[in-house]
Amino acid sequence: MPEVTVTEHLLLHQKKSPAATGQFTTLLNDLVLSAKIISRSVTKAGLLDVLGGTGEVNVQGELVQKLDEFANRVLIYRMERSGAVCAMASEENADIIKVPEKLHRGDYVLIFDPLDGSSNIDVNINVGTIFSILRRKSPASDDVCIDDVLQPGYEQVAAGYILYGPSTMLVFSTGQGVHGFTLDPSVGEFLLSHPDMSIPERGRIYSINESYWNYWDEPTREIVSYFKGDHNERGKPYSLRYVGSLVADFHRTLLYGGIFMYPMDYRHPDKPQGKLRLMCEASPLAFLAEQAGGRAIDGSRRILDVCPGTLHERIPLFIGSARDVDKVEEIYARHRA
C-alpha cells in the first residue's frame, strides 16, 4: 500500500469539495504537529518529570495533571498561530479562548480535551487528545462570541482524536468516512494505516464501569444485565472490557464493535448527567461513530442533535455498534412509556 500522509489525504479529499480552502488543511497540519510534540512528551513522561499532578484544580473540579497542563499549552500556542482558528475551547479552561487580535483570526473554532485519561499516565495506560472543529457563525468583521462555540454536533466540520499508546494514532473524519493514521517515528509522519474504518453492526464487547451499579437507575441496570447475560440477541454474554481512558475504550469499540456506556448516576449531586463533556468528548466521538456506521445517544436523543447550553455541559453517552445502541434506546423507551 502506498504510504499516504495526512496532508496528502486531506488535499485529495479537498479536491472533491468546491467549498474547501487551504485554511482547513493548515489547521489539521498544526494539530498534527501538536500531536507529535505531545506524543514525544508522553513517551518520555517518566524521564521528564511530567508525571503526577500540578496541585491545581481545573474548572471541572478535577486535579490537573502535569501532562494535561503541558498538552493544553502546546495546543493553545500552536493553534493561536495557525491563522485558521478564531477561538478555542478547552476542557481545562473555564471560558472560550479568543485568538488575540494581533494574530490572524481564521474561520474555524477548535474545541478539545488536551489529554483525556491523563490520570492513567502514571501507570502507563493509553491517553488521548480529542478534538472537534466548527465553522464560526458570526461575520468575520465581528468579535467572536460564545454562540460561535455553542453549536450542536451535526454542525461539526471535522472531529477526531490522537491516541498515545504503543503507537501514536490519529483518527479523524471530515464527513467523508473515518480514517486512521499511525505515526512512523522513522520519518516523523502520520501515515494512512486504517482507511475507511467502520464499526460492525453488532459487537461482542460492552464497556462500562460496573462498580457504579448501586448508583444507577433501574433501566440502566437492565441494560447492563442484557449485555452481561445470555438472554440477549447473541444468545451469550458480551465480554466486558473497560480501560477507564475514553479514547482507548472508544478506539477498541470503533475497531471491534460493541458498546461503550457512561450513563447518568447518583454518585455526585453536582454531576447528575454523568462525567463526560458534550462538546469536547461526546460530540466529536459521536461524529466519528456515525461516520463509521455506528450510533451515539444519551439514552433517548441523538448526541449530534443536542444543542449545548453551556461550555462544559455534561451528558450521558451510549456509543458504538448500531444494533447494540438500538437496544439501549429500546429499553429506556420502554421504561419511559
Swiss-Prot record:
An MF annotation (GO) of this entry: magnesium ion binding
Subcellular location: Cytoplasm
Domain of life: Bacteria
Principal cellular location given in the protein's record: cytoplasm
Amino acids binding substrate: 116-119, 209, 242, 275
Keyword entries, A-Z: Carbohydrate metabolism, Cytoplasm, Hydrolase, Magnesium, Metal-binding
Catalytic activity of the protein: beta-D-fructose 1,6-bisphosphate + H2O = beta-D-fructose 6-phosphate + phosphate
Family recorded in the similarity comment: Belongs to the FBPase class 1 family.
Official protein name in the record: Fructose-1,6-bisphosphatase class 1
Organism in which the protein naturally occurs: Nitratidesulfovibrio vulgaris (strain ATCC 29579 / DSM 644 / CCUG 34227 / NCIMB 8303 / VKM B-1760 / Hildenborough) (Desulfovibrio vulgaris)
